Amino acid sequence: MPEKMKTIELNGNNFSNLSEFYNEVERKMTSGLNWKIGRNLDAFNDVLSGGFGIHNVDENYQLNWKNAEKSKLDLGWTQTIDFIENKLKTCHPTNIEFVKKDLEDAKNGTGETLWELIIGIIKEHNQIELKLN
């Protein structure tokens, strides 16, 4: 009999901004670490791959995102603009013009929201079956 696929649940009611989202990811997708995961999308991408105490590297699993519509709103344009403004403060000087363009787009409601970026990162992982509830 095939082994049942592991299910990990993120709950949109547990966060309303990017910082709280990272806390939820750490609570639900890591275990036994004596350090905190990075608070950035690259670290999130790494956690999705596994090896942080909840699922093994490249193990197939279902990621159930409860209250996803709330998260879609919470991680919409306002949070996206904040995210890009912070990125502008720390980006390499050669990237400033690109980031400024991203910020202008976000302020005009074009480009990708944080929600869309996060969903895109998840969908890059073939071992993840994403369920939005």
Stretches found by the model and what they are:
Residues 1-35, 39, 43, 50-133:
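N-terminal intrinsically disordered, low-complexity segments enriched in P/E/S/T
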